[in-house]
Amino acid sequence: MLNSIKVGFIVLLTLFTSLNVQAAGGIALGATRVIYPSAAKQTSLAISNSDTQERYLVNSWIENNAGQKEKTFIVTPPLFVSEPKSENTLRIIYAGQPLPGDRESLFWMNVKAIPSVDKSHIEGKNVLQLAILSRIKLFVRPANLPQTPEDAPTLLKFSRVGNHLKITNPSAYYLTLVNISVGAKKIDNVMIAPKSDMQIPLPTGAQGNVTFQSVNDYGALTSATTASLG
């Protein structure tokens, strides 16, 4: 799924002889995306540690769509220790200039979990310690948009431009489309920005209606929708 959590592995520490590997598998986010109402002073994201023994150092920050750290957001606490079998809440505060009021704005929430190290267990060993980076979408959503997020996928327009499928999104929402097909031909998942269009190469022999699903605010797939190819 295009909008599932992106996970990256970072090599943090290498020591001496035999090899052990540790991974931060106990940390989980409470959502696959964050919706931040623009009129709200803040929003939140739950983080849980399901591990019965492991502690993790958790570092959180927000990036813009270009992958640069976004200084207009404050995440508190930006750095904390997650104890075994515990839950914590990150507060996310936007402190920048007003964002566009006629459409959503996209950012990326990053949460890196680094497992603790017992030095007595690794002395004289070669240890490869892995951190897990969870990266999910953060949408800043203005109030009083003309459509609901549930209705937005029904407004999409599809047309053929040469050997490409053109998708037009007139709505105010970012839309993630998955399980796309033209007739019997499958097409890669895409995300299309508000009030924009994009073109996707069509597989050879693609004919017929367009069928797709979208991802809702809770990270779940909507029912399949079929649209004519204009």
From Swiss-Prot:
- Fetch the InterPro entries from UniProt: Ig-like_fold (IPR013783), PapD-like_sf (IPR008962), Periplasmic_pilus_chap (IPR050643), Pili_assmbl_chap_C_dom_sf (IPR036316), Pili_assmbl_chaperone_bac (IPR001829), Pili_assmbl_chaperone_C (IPR016148), Pili_assmbl_chaperone_CS (IPR018046), Pili_assmbl_chaperone_N (IPR016147)
Q: What is its main location?
A: periplasm
Q: Which GO terms describe its molecular function?
A: protein folding chaperone
* One Gene Ontology cellular component: outer membrane-bounded periplasmic space
Q: What is this protein called?
A: Chaperone protein FimC
Query: Which family does the similarity line name?
Result: Belongs to the periplasmic pilus chaperone family.
The UniProt keyword set, sorted, is: Chaperone, Fimbrium biogenesis, Immunoglobulin domain, Periplasm, Signal
Q: Where in the cell is it found?
A: Periplasm
Alphabetical GO biological process terms: cell wall organization; chaperone-mediated protein folding
